[in-house]
Swiss-Prot record:
This is Serine/threonine transporter SstT. GO terms for cellular component: plasma membrane. One of its GO terms (molecular function) is neutral L-amino acid:sodium symporter activity. Keywords: Amino-acid transport, Cell inner membrane, Cell membrane, Membrane, Symport, Transmembrane, Transmembrane helix, Transport. It holds the Pfam family SDF. It comes from Serratia proteamaculans (strain 568).
Amino acid sequence: MQKLLQKITQGSLVKQIMVGLVAGIIVALVSPATASAVGLLGALFVGALKAVAPVLVLVLVMASIANHKHGQKTNIRPILFLYLLGTFAAALVAVVVSFMFPSNLALVAGNAEINPPGGIIEVLKGLLLSVVANPFQALISANYIGILAWAVGLGLALRHSSDTTKSLINDMSHAVTMVVRAVIRCAPLGIFGLVASTLAETGFGALWGYAQLLVVLIGCMLLVALVLNPLIVFWKIRRNPYPLVFACLRESGVTAFFTRSSAANIPVNMELCKKLNLNEDTYSVSIPLGATINMAGAAITITVLTLAAVHTLGIPVDVPTALLLSVVAAVCACGASGVAGGSLLLIPLACNMFGIPNDVAMQVVAVGFIIGVLQDSAETALNSSTDVLFTAAACQAEDQRLADEDPLKVR
């Protein structure tokens, strides 16, 4: 019994997740009622991840900054640049693919209760207000912009504290990390529950009517994940990027695909960064920051659905307007985490560029909700895995630079 438990707790998490995935599909096909019931396992897993993620971010960032040594480099600027570059490039890819394979929408009735933001200024205003949120409210509502602001502020203040205080913060950081590891070990059960309940309750029948749109959306995301991102990483590290790309997709992307939450996947990404032996001072800040602003998947969703509406309505689009749409989609995507409903509710902003009435834009949003089972999952997988990928690329590039300058220097 003890050997079995040891095998379960120390075995390959990826293999266990794949077993959970297959088991979930089988249960959903054999007994939909049972599959709906085991959905509780998925809900518990996602709930546990969402519960521990805000505390993890607060404590890790605070500990990292409080113990930061003067002159020690954190690489946040290069990572931030990669985040913004990746998001804009993803929107550009979506524009090109949408022109190559234009989609038509069978527009459905909009949801009257949906309230999208009124403009880009409103989105940016929401992000700025998130910075000055009450710290307890930020933790409760998982407002990661607010959590990061308070963690950075407290960390800077605690730099001047005694060694005992710094030691206490470090111990808290280790304690929270241990809790996170325990939660992540439950991933196979969580994935099993999520897959089984999703297939049993939703199914994929509703998706067939939007097959071409889904192919364009998922195709763009695969193109970004397997071609564009590797090119960016190669430019940064100057060696074969695919081992790193596949490691991030396998260990971060798979979990994010089923949890459908970048915030819930933060602990998974933190653990992967540790496994990749990255600088903790860097990833403890860049991963929660990425979960907030690194939104390549959201940029693709906004662009593809907007251009599908434009094509359906027969509105002509020139090259400068298409480029402007890429910029607008990238800016909107960076604000997607601050909007309830995420990328879908920012589609009316982009539609507004082409003079599309709000009621028609909301019908496009409704189409987005119909295909959300796959769209949201793929979008989150791309967003979250890219957080780790770009963090690792920046860290490895910096390590290589230091090694070239001083071959005897060991980080």
